[in-house]
Curated annotation (Swiss-Prot):
Organism: Arabidopsis thaliana (Mouse-ear cress)
InterPro entries: FAS1_dom_sf, FAS1_domain, FLA_A
Protein name (record): Fasciclin-like arabinogalactan protein 6
Cellular-component GO terms for this entry: plasma membrane; side of membrane
Lineage of source species: Eukaryota, Viridiplantae, Streptophyta, Embryophyta, Tracheophyta
Top-level taxon of origin: Eukaryota
Gene field: FLA6
PANTHER family the UniProt entry points to: FASCICLIN-LIKE ARABINOGALACTAN PROTEIN, FASCICLIN-LIKE ARABINOGALACTAN PROTEIN 13-RELATED
Amino acid sequence: MSSSLFSYVVLLIFLFTIPYIQSQPTAPAPTTEKSPINLTAILEAGHQFTTLIQLLNTTQVGFQVSVQLNSSDQGMTIFAPTDNAFNKLKPGTLNSLTYQQQIQLMLYHIIPKYYSLSDLLLASNPVRTQATGQDGGVFGLNFTGQAQSNQVNVSTGVVETRINNALRQQFPLAVYVVDSVLLPEELFGTKTTPTGAPAPKSSTSSSDADSPAADDEHKSAGSSVKRTSLGIVVSFALFCCSVIYIA
């Protein structure tokens, strides 16, 4: 009898506590905040990108990358030339560029979309960069290689280099190491001479004096003078002979 009463009491307690338990708010699941991606920290970890970091800072392109990375759903692909790549440039190459051209050079190393190495081989050349459209230029990159070996080359029309290891290859950012600075054809291509430009003219006196036609004219004039003088001498001699004969 006592055991039945005890069971009945336990059942009542259970029935009364169920509504209370159901009314309690469910604790929210812990949220994982996505930390912003720091491009400078990624490059510093590579230990060979001092010049690139300096250019990204002075041109403010590094700040632009940070903003876009944390606001775009397309991701981004960056090609990072090593310090040795910059050292291979002709002396004064960077200093010869204007501030705007330095910005274009940095933007040329950035594709506004995330690409894995295999994706680059499937991309339609030329692939647009962040510099595309500036000053009406194409500023595109061309990719070739072999999918089997995962080897990819990038060409600008001025230089071609192999894409080496990745400092990062996880959406939304891929950072690939390159051993040459990607020089855009719009800034470093062969400059042609404007058509229709008049050829330089030399002075008339010197050209006339040195030309074969001028020499012929001088010779012709000299011959004419000689023939005239000879005719006068012959005529005078005949005149003298006729006077002597009459006398």
